[in-house]
């Protein structure tokens, strides 16, 4: 399942699929956080992801439960959790694997400054 982070209202579930989200925002960076509810490192980095989503409104932050979204995991070749895929118009332009807080923060800042 794809969840778009809307931290004012916590998490907003999309009824539509990822392709519709891309069509609605073709020029925006969309960051996909591939996580699992049982994953310790995913839980550890979740507060930072929430902080980044709250701070950087020009980027769309989504969470993808790997146990419910095998199609997206396959599309983006996700092999571990957490994995962060930065996309533009549906194409992966950057990927980070693991609980890499400093790298995640740096990549988000790079993409914000490039907009």
Swiss-Prot record:
GO biological process: determination of adult lifespan
Thioredoxin domain location: 2-114
Feature type site, description Deprotonates C-terminal active site Cys: 33
Family annotation (PANTHER family): THIOREDOXIN-LIKE PROTEIN 1 (PTHR46115)
Disulphide connectivity of cysteines: 39-42
Keywords: Disulfide bond, Electron transport, Redox-active center, Transport
Organism ancestry: Eukaryota, Metazoa, Ecdysozoa, Nematoda, Chromadorea
Stated role: Participates in various redox reactions through the reversible oxidation of its active center dithiol to a disulfide and catalyzes dithiol-disulfide exchange reactions. Shown to facilitate the reduction of insulin disulfide bonds. Might play a role in the reversible nitrosylation of cysteine residues in target proteins, and thereby contributing to the response to intracellular nitric oxide.
Organism this protein belongs to: Caenorhabditis elegans
CDD domains membership: TRX_family
Reported phenotype of the disruption mutant: Increased nitric oxide-evoked calcium flux to cytoplasm in ASJ sensory neurons. Decreased avoidance of P.aeruginosa. Decrease in lifespan. Suppression of lifespan extension induced by dietary deprivation or in an eat-2(ad1116) mutant background and partial suppression in a daf-2(e1370) mutant background. Enhancement of the constitutive dauer formation phenotype in a daf-11(ks67), daf-11(m47), daf-11(sa195), daf-7(e1372), daf-1(e1287) or daf-8(e1393) mutant background at 15 degrees Celsius.
Gene Ontology MF terms: protein-disulfide reductase activity
UniProt gene name: trx-1
Known outcome of mutating residue 73 to S: Elimination of the nitric oxide-evoked calcium flux to the cytoplasm in ASJ sensory neurons. Defect in avoidance of P.aeruginosa
The protein's name in its UniProt record: Thioredoxin-1
Any single Pfam family the record assigns to this protein: Thioredoxin
Residues carrying the site annotation Contributes to redox potential value: 40-41
Protein origin, superkingdom: Eukaryota
InterPro entries to which the protein is assigned, alphabetical: Thioredoxin, Thioredoxin-like_sf, Thioredoxin_CS, Thioredoxin_domain
Active site: 39, 42
Family, as annotated: Belongs to the thioredoxin family.
Keyword Disulfide bond attributed: yes
Tissues in which the protein is found: Expressed in ASJ and ASI ciliated sensory neurons. Expressed in the intestine (at protein level).
Induction statement: Up-regulated in response to dietary restriction and during dauer formation.
GO CC annotations on file: axon; cytoplasm; dendrite; neuronal cell body; non-motile cilium; nucleus
